């Protein structure tokens, strides 16, 4: 191989979406792929862009791991390394990112990678295993995915589904949404409209797979035909559906 790693310098606003996409499509790369961004323009002396880029270089040089990662300073000022598939959108006030599950993969300290031991994280040696490419042909993205995030008094009848193939309901943290009350503000008539239009509906993020531990609202969603996605961020769920509903290639 002619290089030790790849660095993608990215606009911060959509970094979490691109990170998820690159993570799913390039899991097989034999060298680390690093994404990074800055909280301010690089000409601003307060920008963290240079530190984030340097940490990406140090990780490639010293960590001895392959996979897709994000280098970005956290709110404590530590140089965090995130699994790219778990990065969540930056806070609108502090401009800092957080990982789904709350645990960064590790930190860069004086040029060395320090793993963050957590039940949420894979062990570093797990990332050294070889992975098969997801696709042999370049992916295509033509069919859009409609992502709906419920909030109180949401008017579901405002969402047209006639030309929509797939909907992602990114639910409240308990995997719930309003299932009672007026037809316009209950998610169940919306799901029924999707069913009649042959529109697939996915819900995230579910925690429990055992029916005995579900809330009544979770039961109602599943009984209405929602396909559950478990323990997944909005960005990762959206990106996976974009990939799944746009490719013709299947694994052999």
Predicted regions and their residues:
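Active-site histidine-anchored catalytic micro-motif
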Residues: 1-252
């Amino acid at each position: 191989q002619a290089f030790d790693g790849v660095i993608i310098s990215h606009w911060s606003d959509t970094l979490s979406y691109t990170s998820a996409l690159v993570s799913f499509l390039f899991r097989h790369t034999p060298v680390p792929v690093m994404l990074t961004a800055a909280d301010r323009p690089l000409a601003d002396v307060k920008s963290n862009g240079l530190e984030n880029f340097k940490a990406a270089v140090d990780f490639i040089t010293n960590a001895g791991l392959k996979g897709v990662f994000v280098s970005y300073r956290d709110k404590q000022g530590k140089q965090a390394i995130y699994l790219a598939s778990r990065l969540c959108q930056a806070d609108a006030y502090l401009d800092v990112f957080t990982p789904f599950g709350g645990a960064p993969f590790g930190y860069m300290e004086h040029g060395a990678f320090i793993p963050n031991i957590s039940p949420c994280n894979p062990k570093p040696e797990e990332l050294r295993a070889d992975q098969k490419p997801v696709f042999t042909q370049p992916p295509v993205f033509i069919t859009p995915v409609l992502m709906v995030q419920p909030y109180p008094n949401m008017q579901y009848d405002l969402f047209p589904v006639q030309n929509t193939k797939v909907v992602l309901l990114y639910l409240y943290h308990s995997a719930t949404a309003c299932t009672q009350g007026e037809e316009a503000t209950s998610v169940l008539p919306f799901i029924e409209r999707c069913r009649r239009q042959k529109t697939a509906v996915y819900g995230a993020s579910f925690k429990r797979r055992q029916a005995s531990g579900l809330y009544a609202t979770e039961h109602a969603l599943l009984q209405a035909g929602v396909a559950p996605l478990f323990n997944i961020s909005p960005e990762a769920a959206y990106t996976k559906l974009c990939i799944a509903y746009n490719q013709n290639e299947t694994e052999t």
